[in-house]
């Protein structure tokens, strides 16, 4: 038995090299802005002998539009589990993953993977990359000065018109993502976050239109991080990790801008971003090798340490800096996760209605 284990250990580097050698050429990745540690990509290129061409987007609508047109040319994409990933699975737009080429699949947290299995039975088409919540990015120094009793852990802070009017002078923003914003508004209104009911959508639109005159911007993810970090805005509805990135940049700038994140106490929108391979990917072998490389604990620790989003590889946690590992805004406590909701996947008709709603919201003043 010992000899067999020793032989397996001796052969392991050769087996890994062989698996990576089977995936040659160029890997085309399409991912969110500021959503990976560049050093991880560089290590993959060195070890696999595969050049990575890396493009970025800052909204799910941009990603889905590119994939819906077909022949995107990408080997790896990173759609959010619901609704984008769910729709792509249903449409047959994603390739089933070859688990034999992804031995590090075993590192994934089965509890989290079970959450996405409802839209991808058997987890055949995707592995969780990173996850997080949608909540409030707050410039704490300004908001506390303006309103010491402000309800920082509630969407009331932004969505109640009288509160928005009170804080408008220091800059308010909502990320340009109907997929993420509308479910949060519906939840705040006490409605089903995945509702297709015309009355529910009208109520959500009314809330957004009442907020619109007080907004300084409706930016994409990357621009919103910059606006928070520089203090241009003081309250934003956005992704948890974007706020944490903005807080880190603000500290580095040393100008006294203090940024914090608050998940709504009534329940936050929980999302999972998935590593997936388009059905017409030009280099699926390289895609499987890249997914396997990312699922190494050391890779995921480096990524979480850089972008400040939690990952789904528990073995990476001991490798994280204590300040990251123990930060409840990065890894929420179990009680907060129990209150969180995954918004579900609206029907195509409901999605079209939401898109029209969002267009009217953006165009209004």
Describe each PLM feature range:
Residues 278-339:
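Mature extracytoplasmic/periplasmic domains
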Residues 80-85, 89-216, 222-225, 229:
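Extracytoplasmic ligand-binding site segments that recognize negatively charged/polar headgroups
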Residues 201-211, 218, 255-276:
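Periplasmic-binding protein-like
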Residues 95-106, 253-269, 278-281:
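Short beta-strand->loop
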Residues 334-365:
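Conserved C-terminal helix/tail region of periplasmic/extracytoplasmic solute-binding proteins
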Residues 24-89:
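Early extracytoplasmic/lumenal segment of secretory-pathway proteins
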Residues 137-142, 187-190, 271-283, 302:
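A bilobed periplasmic-binding-protein/Venus flytrap-type ligand-binding module shared by bacterial periplasmic
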Residues 83-87, 235-256:
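A ligand-binding cleft/hinge motif common to bilobed small-molecule-binding domains
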